[in-house]
Amino acid sequence: MNSVTVSHAPYTITYHDDWEPVMSQLVEFYNEVASWLLRDETSPIPDKFFIQLKQPLRNKRVCVCGIDPYPKDGTGVPFESPNFTKKSIKEIASSISRLTGVIDYKGYNLNIIDGVIPWNYYLSCKLGETKSHAIYWDKISKLLLQHITKHVSVLYCLGKTDFSNIRAKLESPVTTIVGYHPAARDRQFEKDRSFEIINVLLELDNKVPINWAQGFIY
């Protein structure tokens, strides 16, 4: 692991070698906006903004991307809910349960699945207010997602409205699926078969499919 210092909390960002090409720009951009961001109480707390930068990228095949953290109790790991109370991760688990037949589980975490990196486009929000920090993170968000897409085969974005123009923001050619948000009304997410489609796309690209059942916690 490597680390860099920034002028505001969290003061030190620890990161895996695979993120090295974007770190100097990340530090520059963060130092520009941090004082604005940190006027608010945030979800997650600043010490957890950059936790996912500890993840390697070279072994990832799929990025599952949400728009921003839970407005309360964000852990820095996208979609993670240690007490398994958040609707988004419960809906994701339910979808994977139908796909895999696994039913006796106590939780689900995308971050423990081989080949998958869960990501949030914006890395924080004001406590209780989704997308409230979008304006501050925008340059950093583009920089980091762009870097991730150089490594993965499939980018799966959850939220048809939030990600309607995501392809225009990306320079690397990456297969992109824009699906329903897990909390979408009329159970649209339930009818969405993106997890299956991702594996078909990986096989077409001669890559190993994702074992989605690995995310279950028992």
Swiss-Prot record:
Superkingdom, taxonomy of origin: Viruses
Catalytic activity: Hydrolyzes single-stranded DNA or mismatched double-stranded DNA and polynucleotides, releasing free uracil
GO molecular function terms listed in the Swiss-Prot or TrEMBL record: DNA binding; uracil DNA N-glycosylase activity
Keyword DNA repair: yes
GO annotation, biological process: DNA repair; viral DNA genome replication
Active site, UniProt feature: D68
Protein's UniProt name: Uracil-DNA glycosylase
